[in-house]
Amino acid sequence: MMRRLLLMLPFVVFLGLAFFLYRGLSLDPSARESALIGQAFPAFTLPTLEDPDTEVDESLLRGQISLVNVWASWCPTCKEEMPQLLALSERGIQMVGINYKDARDLGRQFLEEFGKPFEVNIFDPAGDLGFEIGVYGVPETFLVDADGIVRYKHVGYITPAQVDEVMMEVEKWR
């Protein structure tokens, strides 16, 4: 009897691992919940990417709806996302970029090459602000309402098909 149980143990372990693997692979990574939803965007004071002597803070995200996109020059999907961000910037939304864990010169070159959808680019070379807002990886996009409250988070790059979905979220909070 004991021998039979020992022979079945690897099979049971295999089934358990297979279940958890299947469950993990079936989850949508862009649907991750964020503890920041419904909370004020965290306080920060950081320089802009363009000018190290110009600092901005969280007040930048008050008074109008903003899309805050976390990006980096070393991120291949950030390049793919740029046309969609440019399209969103043409729809009258304040676009704010957070250049995450990057070198200033590389971030500037990236924008020269792929476009400048952002009114302001926050330079976060150490990733401290990214940590505060719970960034898992880049790109990630946050919708911040006119009161500075985070209302929506999109994990991963925004595809052409998702531009209208993002705009529907924007319209909910206008």
For each predicted feature, which ranges?
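Short gly/ser/thr-rich secondary-structure transition/capping motifs
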Residues: 25-27, 47-54, 76, 121-124
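Structural microenvironment flanking redox-active thiols in thiol-disulfide oxidoreductases
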Residues: 79-115, 125-131
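Hydrophobic beta-strand core positions in alpha/beta domains
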Residues: 67-69, 97, 143
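Thiol/disulfide oxidoreductase modules built on the thioredoxin-like
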Residues: 112-117, 124-171
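Short pre-active-site segment immediately N-terminal to redox-active cysteine/selenocysteine motifs
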Residues: 64-66, 70-74, 137
